[in-house]
A protein has these predicted regions:
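C-terminal regulatory/interaction regions
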Residues: 1, 6, 231-286
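Residue-level signal for inorganic ion chemistry
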Residues: 40, 63, 204, 229, ...
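Short Pro/Gly-enriched beta-strand edge/turn motifs at strand-loop
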Residues: 17-24, 109-110, 136-140
Length: 286
């Protein structure tokens, strides 16, 4: 504990063996104030940096401190991975390039949103990579969970799952009506639960130990909200404003814009399943 060169390093929060986290200040959904940037791999071996979402001087300083430590360890950075294209996860790549250079990996949808002149590598469901270390190696497999955002990926390893924006212990996860998919989001949560990981490393907030219960709560909450939206339409409500007010009557302090956006996401899924239809701008039961 009193060592001048502690084994864990001066700028290191180790969530699991071969999984470190640094907090990048970002403009994200309150109450979260930061995005979790994960550094995968053993000290002194191959490393992968996930979601280094820097866009200002504070974020730059945080990432530079970590990369300086990585270099001191004589580690090699294999790649930068972005889990999805939302702005609180993407980086100013010119700033990142001032700190280190490495190929950028991400889904095709994510890579399209990144302004970067260096090497990019599209990754897909089922792809995997190894990070060799002096004492142990770590293997990570890519799975796709696109409900929160098209092209969102998670990384599955023995240590747990780098789970991006699927669930959090701080606040909630939105499924934007603009490009989200509520049905795919719920299916993604069910898939993560079925993998039965012992830990999730989320995009925001603390790590999630024994996450099966939290994932089940998320699934039940979203399915329950979808039923409330459906019941609102059955009751004769036909506009987004009316449907959202009815479906979120149990949370009167909710932001109206957010409740309407989430109600619309649920309605889009109900349109997909054929349970409701839209006629002259009004939602009706099929």
């Amino acid at each position: 504990v009193l060592s001048k060169d502690p084994p864990s390093g001066p700028h290191r929060f180790e969530y699991a063996s071969g999984v470190e986290c640094i907090l990048i200040p970002t403009t994200t959904l309150p109450p979260a104030t930061h995005t979790n940037c994960f550094v995968l791999g053993e000290r002194g071996g191959m490393r992968a940096i996930v979601d280094p979402a820097i866009k200002d001087e504070d974020g730059f300083d945080e990432l530079k401190k970590k990369v300086d430590e990585i270099r001191k360890d004589k580690s090699e950075i294999l790649c930068t991975i972005f889990t999805h294209r939302h702005q609180d996860h993407l980086a100013d790549m010119e700033m990142v390039s001032q700190i280190y250079e490495a190929p950028v990996w991400g889904s095709p949808e994510t890579l399209e949103a990144i302004a970067y002149n260096g090497e990019t590598v599209p990754i897909h469901e089922g792809d995997s990579f190894n990070l060799d270390g002096p004492k142990f190696d770590t293997k990570w497999e890519v799975i796709e969970t696109p409900g929160h955002c098209p092209g969102q990926i998670c990384l599955v390893g023995e240590q747990g799952i780098v789970s991006a924006d699927n669930c959090t212990m701080v606040g909630s996860i939105l499924v934007p009506s603009s490009d989200g998919d509520m049905g795919a989001y719920i299916s993604g949560l069910e898939r993560l639960r079925d993998i039965n990981p012992h830990t999730l490393f989320p995009g925001h907030g603390p790590l999630i130990p024994n996450p099966k219960r939290l994932l089940s709560e998320y699934i039940n909450h979203r399915k329950g909200r979808q039923m409330k939206v459906l019941e609102a339409v059955k009751s004769g409500h036909s506009s987004i404003q009316q449907i959202a007010k009815s479906a979120y009557s149990d949370t009167p302090d909710v932001n109206p814009a957010l409740s309407q956006d989430q109600a619309l996401s649920h309605l889009k899924d109900l349109l997909r399943t054929g349970e409701v239809f839209l006629l002259s701008g009004k939602y009706q039961i099929s």
